[in-house]
């Protein structure tokens, strides 16, 4: 096919000897061919019969988002937000066809030399109609939603959580729930975890962005965005209502706080005066 560059990838039994790895390789080929989206790496069907196992993908030149961030440590927050948008659009394309990526992390978001972001690696992906979905683990535990550790059903909100962890880490250099996240295995252990504001690690992160990340990173999937489209909207147009909810009461109502404090002190003074006059 003239004018088009390919990147063939062959399954090597000596490196990947187990059946799970073989199925992952086949799954990446099959799922990859189902999608033709500008923000998803293209996988092509072979033009001739296969005599050994391989897959063909478009040739990409560039770096993973992790490598890009390392090479650009001073990149502004606005640039990271700009990268988050095509990542969300790519995941939405998957979710519309009942497909979960299950391994969203900085290494699986690729930045081309032209600055375009591509979602790659479908080895851990699942399709809603496949019965083995619950038995498949997510790729990297530090990015995986709690649903995987708890062994419960998951949907697109699990990918949402992983994406939010990815960009939280890229913005701050830390994970949102600290080192104890990987130790949590039960609902009670997850309930004890506390979200750390991204603003604490990086003062350049605006409060509205931290609020959006905090919602997408809710440990309870019911508290995350129902759809990735809503997350995208809050990244494109800052949600002041969400920001207000995320701010401590004192920051939301500083004047009222000091008014109530003054009234309380006045009442205490009257009580002390009454006791002294007795």
Give the predicted meaning of each segment.
Residues 16-34:
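AlphaC helix of the eukaryotic protein kinase fold
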Residues 89-99:
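Protein kinase catalytic-loop region centered on the HRD/HxD motif
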Residues 142-242:
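C-terminal lobe helix-coil module of Hanks-type protein kinase domains
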Residues 65-75:
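AlphaC helix of the protein kinase catalytic domain
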Residues 50-64:
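Conserved short submotifs of the Hanks-type protein kinase catalytic core
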Residues 83-84:
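Activation segment signature within eukaryotic-like protein kinase domains
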Residues 46:
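Activation-segment/catalytic-loop signature of the eukaryotic protein kinase fold
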